[in-house]
Design a protein with these regions (language model features):
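Phosphate/NTP-binding elements of NTP-utilizing enzymes
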Residues: 1-157
């Protein structure tokens, strides 16, 4: 009976560890919807401009987070395929409508939800929004900006 109890406790512990791993590395377990996969196929085919539009809650923001995240990681963690950008340093910009609602309320939580914990370092801007994300392994970055910022700030890096 003790052996059975030990095994049951071990099973519960392993299930807890797996759930924790999945939560911290959600991008590895990303399963694209059909319309998301079609968009990924276009990106992976080298298309320079791709548009995914549609109703609320169809996964547009999620897809944006995993595409930008995989570009910064240098690999698509959900299928282990290389990205079209390879493992080189990439600099990504996400243009938000505003800092408080869109950047801080939508984009930052989605990036945190999908990007693997411990693989990036975040810095806040002067407003307190986590607007600069750096991936030390690749040197890649994600910079959040708003469309209300002066045009000069959007020019170049």
């Amino acid at each position: 009976m003790d052996r059975r109890r030990e095994l049951l406790e071990r099973k519960v512990e392993l299930e807890r560890m797996l759930a924790e791993y999945k939560e911290s590395n959600r991008i590895q377990f990303f399963q694209p919807f059909e319309h998301q996969q079609r968009t990924l196929d276009l990106i992976n085919a080298g298309k320079k401009v791709v548009l995914l539009q549609g109703a609320n809650q169809i996964g547009k923001t999620t897809l944006g987070a995993v595409v930008v995240g995989s570009a910064c990681l240098g690999i698509q963690p959900w299928d282990m395929r290389p990205t079209v950008w390879g493992k080189r340093k990439v600099e990504c910009r996400i243009i938000c409508q505003d800092w408080e609602h869109h950047a801080d309320g939508v984009i930052v939580p989605e990036l945190k939800r999908w990007l693997p914990k411990g693989r990036y370092v975040v810095r806040k801007n002067n407003i307190g929004v986590e607007a600069y994300w750096e991936f030390p392994e690749t040197g890649s970055t994600i910079e959040l900006m708003t469309d209300s910022q002066p045009t000069e700030l959007h020019e170049g890096w």
